[in-house]
């Protein structure tokens, strides 16, 4: 992982902010990790967050930020299975095979799934999970389309010779779904925790004492609960696969709709099942 100053340089570049003075770098990164995660982000903020995540180093710190946020929520209510499920969703971002573009799509849909999935029991009910996922996709598809139209994504797709970005994403999401299993979720959770421990361990020596105490307390909790959480998230393999497969199908459907619209100017294709 890059050092604290490299991360600060990248973050400042993205946000257009001056890099803080040397003594404030650790505090700045700590505040970014604990403060920037917001479940109630606007649609514009979600898309901007995904574009920011395309930048190396910032991508890593965004993953760490989201993982830390979910672990803090788990600490408040360790019996809440939905929180464990959201940790499992976050862990998918640590799968290296998906790349930054696919990860951006995955994160957008997961943000919306959180809004529409309200009961842990629904994870075990295929009908209710499918209904919640499709509602989330109705809301998320315009944002996914916006993200995939961003200049950084377009430049990447052009460079890589990707003819249809929607079909490309659909194919890779299907492949990702097949790779999700309990063992891999635990392994990637462990990697994510280690990345968080490494970053926070580096900055704790350059933050004020009061912040260091909070940081040490969080690191202690993570160390104590790491194995328990890692074992528990394996139960969500099937729900995650379902969400990824439904997303892949909707993106593939949208690719076909867009193709049809191009060849039939008299019909306007809907972005969602509701025609929105």
Q: Model-found features: residue ranges?
A:
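Long, low-complexity, intrinsically disordered regions
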Residues: 1-276
């Amino acid at each position: 992982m890059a050092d604290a100053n490299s991360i600060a340089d990248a973050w400042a570049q993205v946000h257009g902010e001056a890099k803080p003075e040397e003594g404030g770098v650790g505090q700045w990164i700590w505040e970014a990790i604990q403060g920037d995660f917001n479940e109630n982000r606007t649609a514009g903020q979600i898309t901007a967050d995904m574009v920011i995540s395309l930048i190396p180093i910032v991508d890593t710190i965004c993953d760490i930020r989201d993982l830390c946020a979910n672990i803090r929520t788990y600490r408040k209510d360790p019996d809440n299975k939905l929180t464990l499920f959201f940790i499992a969703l976050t862990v998918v971002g640590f799968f290296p095979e998906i790349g930054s573009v696919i990860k951006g799509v995955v994160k957008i849909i997961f943000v919306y799934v959180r809004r529409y999935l309200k009961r842990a029991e629904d994870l075990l009910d295929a009908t209710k999970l499918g209904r919640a996922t499709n509602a989330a996709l109705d809301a998320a598809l315009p944002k996914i389309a916006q993200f995939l139209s961003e200049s950084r994504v377009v430049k990447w797709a052009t460079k890589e010779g990707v003819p249809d970005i929607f079909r490309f994403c659909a194919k890779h999401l299907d492949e990702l779904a097949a790779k999700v299993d309990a063992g891999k979720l635990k392994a990637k959770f462990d990697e994510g925790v280690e990345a968080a421990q490494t970053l926070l361990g580096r900055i704790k020596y350059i933050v004020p004492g009061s912040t260091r105490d909070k940081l040490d307390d969080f690191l202690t909790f993570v160390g104590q609960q790491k194995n328990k959480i890692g074992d528990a998230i394996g139960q969500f393999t099937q729900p995650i696969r379902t969400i990824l497969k439904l997303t892949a199908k909707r993106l593939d459907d949208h690719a076909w709709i867009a193709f049809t619209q191009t060849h039939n100017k008299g019909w306007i294709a809907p972005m969602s099942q509701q025609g929105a």
